[in-house]
Amino acid sequence: MITTTKPIKAHFDPVADLLTKINNARKAKLMTVTTIASKLKIAILEILVKEGYLANFQVLENKSKTKRIVTFNLKYTQRRIPSINGVKQISKPGLRIYRPFEKLPLVLNGLGIAIISTSDGVMTDKVARLKKIGGEILAYVW
């Protein structure tokens, strides 16, 4: 099992930080990734586990009790092909992208998911359409 050993650094854009770590781990075929936890990151990881893109995740308390750490395991097939083929951040700190539920995008014609931040919390585009809620498009995962 391969794990990351680099020191954990805070990032000003938690979505970009998480997506970059997922993408780099996917390309390097790492099993386990560790990052600083936030409510938004945990909500995104819950969606990715529920949709089958990640195996699992665990939130741990840091030894100094100042910051929580989240560790997650990427999911691979028996041939070591990652379940996540790609991730793309859509809404960024300098340019937020909001859409009503009628105009929420289909990622790869429904084969991927869009992660949406709504007034009811973070959810996939499919759930947002069912609830008829629009929101900020955080990322695409396929």
Curated annotation (Swiss-Prot):
Transmembrane segments: none annotated. Pfam families: Ribosomal_S8 (PF00410). It comes from the Bacteria. Keywords: Ribonucleoprotein, Ribosomal protein, RNA-binding, rRNA-binding. One of its GO terms (biological process) is translation. PROSITE patterns: RIBOSOMAL_S8 (PS00053). One of its GO terms (cellular component) is ribosome. One of its GO terms (molecular function) is rRNA binding. Belongs to the universal ribosomal protein uS8 family. NCBIfam families: PRK00136.1 (NF001109). One of the primary rRNA binding proteins, it binds directly to 16S rRNA central domain where it helps coordinate assembly of the platform of the 30S subunit. Part of the 30S ribosomal subunit. Contacts proteins S5 and S12. This is Small ribosomal subunit protein uS8.
